[in-house]
Amino acid sequence: MGIKGLSQLILDEAKDSVKEDQLKNYFGRKVAIDASMAMYQFLIALKNTGMDLTDKDGEVTNHLQGLLARTTKMLEYGIKPCYVFDGKPPQLKSGELEKRKERQKEAMEQFALAQEEGDEEKMVMWNKRTTRMTKEQSNDGKKLLRLMGVPVVEAPGEAEAQCAELCKGGLVYATATEDMDALTYATPVLARHLTFSEARKQPIQEFTFKQVIEGLGVTVDQFIDICILCGCDYTDSIKGIGPKKALAMIKKYGNIENLLKNIEGKHYQAPSEFPYEEVRNIFKNPDVTPSSELVDTMKWTEPDEEGLIEFLVKEKQFDEERVRGYIKRIKSSRGKPTQTRLDGFFTPVASSSTTKKKAPAKKDDKKSATDKKRKAADASTSSKKKK
């Protein structure tokens, strides 16, 4: 879920802390990617088309296709991605996880109803909401990335917190996730939409933590309190206090303790259980592996060609010719000379307006039904494929 309304609050109140750019301008950058978030995007990408990719056992492989295509594109742009996988969530998150299960159950019931009524539009909508990342899918993603020569970090706790630790430790330039709580974990740079398909024509939205704090006119501790008041995964928020009011009240009262004293008896309603002190501690002292212990993990190596063929073609029924094409592109990307970075590409923005992108790739000649599905997946994960 992240932090409710935080991105818009920052765009409204600290617009100079947000910049837009295109993926290709991240050449030479190392980025830590929230793997679960990225793979979830890939899983639902084909839900809109009703063209789920599956293996011989009928298991969906959309996430592997998306991971292969998008990671290859990043490598071709000279970006070095590191994928960070979630570990055990904090106990305080159990309530939010239970709510997600309930929403998934409702979505499954609504999907079945839409199926009975033959309402295809609602079927697609509810089908997307039933999607959850399984442990098997997560393990398959790790296996694919390692075979591609891309580093994988398994966080002891929340992936966003581990990404932030890698960024604070100087091992990567940015945390790439859609969850705004990466900023609450004090990642120096947050890059949203980095794993989106270029076909979506949505620019990368980059937040700089130091400028966010300065723009909002608060301390780091106050920023954490604002995020808690906005609403996060670890506790319910106070009814009647949204993002802008949270900012104003923390500026006025200094912290949640003083705020609670001053709203007592008024129309604001705090949750019966409001463990804000524990939530604060989660954000300030998250369960992470120190970046100093992960230096040797952050290595990008040659792809395991035969391993990829065995896994993707023989186990997952990917088209061999297309897989070998990806392998060739990955190898070619490693042979490119290092370019000098020019950091003047970024332009500050006040809203998430789109920028022009390249036109989508032309359709290839029709082959088998399976191959057509693979092409559809490519179109949803990359706007242009190198021949």
Swiss-Prot record:
Ranges of Low complexity compositional bias? 378-387
Q: What is its EC number?
A: 3.1.-.-
**Cellular localisation:** Nucleus, Nucleolus; Nucleus, Nucleoplasm; Mitochondrion
Q: Where is this region: N-domain?
A: 1-104
Which SUPFAM superfamilies does this entry report, sorted A to Z? 5' to 3' exonuclease, C-terminal subdomain, PIN domain-like
* Highest taxon in the source lineage: Eukaryota
What cofactors does this protein use?
Mg(2+)
- What family classification does the UniProt entry report for this protein? Belongs to the XPG/RAD2 endonuclease family. FEN1 subfamily.
Q: What is this protein called?
A: Flap endonuclease 1
What organism, scientifically named, is this protein from?
Naegleria gruberi (Amoeba)
